[in-house]
């Protein structure tokens, strides 16, 4: 920078020596000019990539605010500012000395001097205009790029909204198909409704419409969750099951370029305020959503590729202060990993909020084959703890009642009848009993499936305890069998093994013969017929049977009460068949 032929003043040499001494002290004799050039170029876009010695660029560079650059760049700019001021002062002194010399010798050309001054002024004005024009062009270019990025982001958000709407319609169609399938099934306990996963029916559509984030969308929202995708290298995919469907997310790998070839370094990228606000809305409501809190936190940590510091940052937004204080008291919470911190916060929520009772969920819990007794009890324990609101050390009896009632009906009846003291047993004692009766039921079902149909009809019905059940008789080949069957006092049961919940009287499922409403209605209509069966009889043995009375004439059947005079006159008139009395 400046004229190398002129000798710099002592002040400039002193500043130069001080700056060189500072560089040797701070940087051990080496200065990272590449990093300084990059730092200046961010604030001054017209700065060349390899640096420059042009005065016009340095005069603009020293105007950069020092608080917007790094420390070493600020030191360099301070030094250059001093150098430029010293150079301007030296130039002014040289011009003054030259003018005085011209005045002494009397060879000053005033017109030539004025022409040179005007020429220098025009050159400086032209240089300033060029700089302002380039700054204006660069600013307009940045504004156009920002507008284009906003337009692209809005278009991609519209596409994602359309994809989510299509997925929601597909889920509604799958639920409707499942309900129609349930309605077509007969009301029989031997049939089991196959619970179909909604995600399997729409796996092809989900794979074609999976929400994937891109690097051009830092605020991309995927199924209610914001993703971060700045400065990513190779994306990593993760599949999360949400609302019965499999959703594939794309989270960034936190590897940032170091500027030295292809080498990268992991840098922590904390949550942004917009992401924290959206995650607070998506978090399950407390305390009702405590059972789903652990799963939601685990999915969020996997989607955002979070570490322990991110968990603490998210906890300050979604959890109140008492919950965070309780979690901090837990031993080892400060140095715990991500999974341990999530479990600590769930435990703190259970301790802070009152227990939520949902006995409907507990009563609806049932055994699902092919579970073992241990797996069934383990799953039941989770459901009971999340919905009972009782302390575990005082909930043994209701828990055992829950697991026994949730077994298949035949297994439940066999366990209760074979073990009258089942309600007083402990959990380790009841698990082997349940496994024993489940094995008996499975062997009996397998034996029935392997036996041919003809042998099943010929075999007597067997219960799980070995007692013979009722088997209906077969229709005979006697002549006029249908006429003889009409004269039987009570209908016979159908052949074969009748399901245990079918009535032998009305042949309708849902109750037994002793509780049949049709049987009670028929007996109520018969009235006090006595001991004589359907034809009636005396209520006691000492009373004789009443004489049968012949029915009256047809036109008098309607008169069952007291007959007045008009009715007597009408009945006394003579009339012929086919006519009616006047």
Swiss-Prot record:
Report CCHC-type zinc finger ranges: 501-518
Q: Where is this region: Disordered?
A: 168-222
Compositionally biased intervals (Basic and acidic residues): 168-178
Keyword terms of this UniProt record = Capsid protein, Coiled coil, Host cell membrane, Host membrane, Lipoprotein, Membrane, Metal-binding, Myristate, Viral nucleoprotein, Virion, Zinc, Zinc-finger
Q: What's the PTM story here?
A: Specific enzymatic cleavages by the viral protease yield mature proteins. The protease is released by autocatalytic cleavage. The polyprotein is cleaved during and after budding, this process is termed maturation.
Q: Please note every region of biased composition (Polar residues).
A: 201-217
Keyword Glycosyltransferase part of the UniProt annotation: no
Coiled-coil zones:
154-185
Q: Where is this site: Cleavage?
A: 95-96, 251-252, 457-458
> What does this protein do, in the record's words?
Capsid protein p25 forms the spherical core of the virion that encapsulates the genomic RNA-nucleocapsid complex.
Protein name, as recorded: Gag polyprotein
Species this protein is from: Walleye dermal sarcoma virus (WDSV)
Question: What does UniProt list as this organism's lineage?
Answer: Viruses, Riboviria, Pararnavirae, Artverviricota, Revtraviricetes
Q: Which gene encodes it?
A: gag
């Amino acid at each position: 920078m400046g004229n190398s032929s002129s000798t710099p003043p002592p002040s400039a040499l002193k500043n130069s020596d001080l700056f060189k001494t500072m560089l040797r002290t701070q940087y051990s004799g080496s200065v990272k000019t590449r990093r300084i050039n990059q730092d200046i170029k961010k604030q001054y876009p017209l700065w060349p990539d390899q640096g420059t010695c042009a005065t016009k660029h340095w005069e603009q560079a020293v105007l950069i605010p020092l608080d917007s650059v790094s420390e070493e760049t600020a030191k360099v700019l301070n030094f250059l500012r001093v150098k430029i001021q010293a150079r301007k002062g030296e130039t002014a002194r040289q011009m003054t000395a030259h003018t005085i010399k011209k005045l002494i010798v009397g060879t000053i050309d005033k017109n030539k001097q004025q022409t040179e001054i005007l020429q220098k002024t025009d050159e400086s004005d032209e240089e300033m205009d060029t700089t302002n024009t380039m700054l204006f062009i660069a600013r307009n270019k940045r504004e156009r790029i920002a507008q284009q990025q906003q337009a692209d982001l809005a278009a991609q958000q519209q596409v994602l909204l359309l994809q989510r709407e299509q997925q929601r319609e597909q889920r509604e169609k799958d639920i409707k198909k499942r309900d129609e399938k349930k309605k077509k099934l007969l009301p029989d306990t031997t049939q089991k409704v196959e619970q179909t996963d909604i995600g399997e029916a729409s796996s092809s559509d989900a794979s074609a419409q999976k929400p994937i984030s891109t690097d051009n969308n830092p605020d991309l929202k995927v199924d209610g969750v914001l993703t971060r995708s700045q400065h990513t290298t190779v994306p990593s995919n993760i599949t999360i099951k949400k609302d019965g469907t499999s959703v594939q997310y794309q989270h960034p790998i936190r590897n940032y370029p170091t500027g030295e070839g292809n080498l990268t370094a992991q840098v922590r990228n904390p949550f942004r305020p917009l992401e924290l606000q959206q995650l607070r809305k998506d978090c399950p409501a407390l305390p009702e959503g405590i059972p789903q809190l652990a799963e939601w936190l685990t999915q969020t940590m996997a989607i955002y590729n979070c570490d322990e510091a991110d968990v603490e940052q998210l906890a300050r937004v979604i959890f109140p202060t008492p919950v965070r204080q309780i979690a901090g008291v837990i031993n080892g919470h400060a140095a715990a990993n991500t999974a341990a911190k999530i479990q600590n916060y769930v435990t703190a929520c259970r301790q802070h909020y009152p227990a939520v009772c949902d006995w409907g969920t507990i009563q609806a819990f049932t055994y699902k084959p092919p579970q073992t007794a241990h797996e069934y009890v383990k799953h039941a324990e989770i459901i009971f703890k999340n919905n009972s609101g009782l302390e575990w050390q005082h909930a043994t009896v209701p828990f055992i009642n829950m697991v026994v009632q949730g077994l298949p009906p035949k297994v439940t009846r066999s366990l209760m009848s074979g073990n009258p003291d089942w309600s007083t047993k402990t959990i380790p004692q009841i698990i082997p009993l349940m496994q024993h009766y489940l094995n008996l039921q499975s062997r009996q079902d397998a034996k029935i499936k392997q036996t041919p149909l003809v042998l099943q009809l010929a075999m007597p019905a067997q219960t799980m305890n070995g007692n013979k059940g009722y088997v209906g008789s077969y229709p005979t080949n006697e002549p006029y069998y249908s006429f003889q069957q009409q004269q039987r006092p009570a209908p016979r049961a159908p052949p074969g093994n009748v399901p245990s919940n079918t009535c032998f009287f009305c042949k309708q499922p849902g109750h037994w013969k002793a509780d049949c409403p049709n049987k009670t209605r028929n007996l109520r209509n018969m009235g006090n017929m006595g001991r004589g069966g359907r034809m009636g009889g005396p209520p006691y043995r000492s009373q004789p049977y009443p004489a049968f009375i012949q029915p009256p004439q047809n036109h008098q059947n309607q008169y069952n009460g007291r007959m007045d005079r008009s009715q007597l006159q009408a009945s006394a008139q003579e009339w012929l068949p086919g006519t009616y009395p006047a």
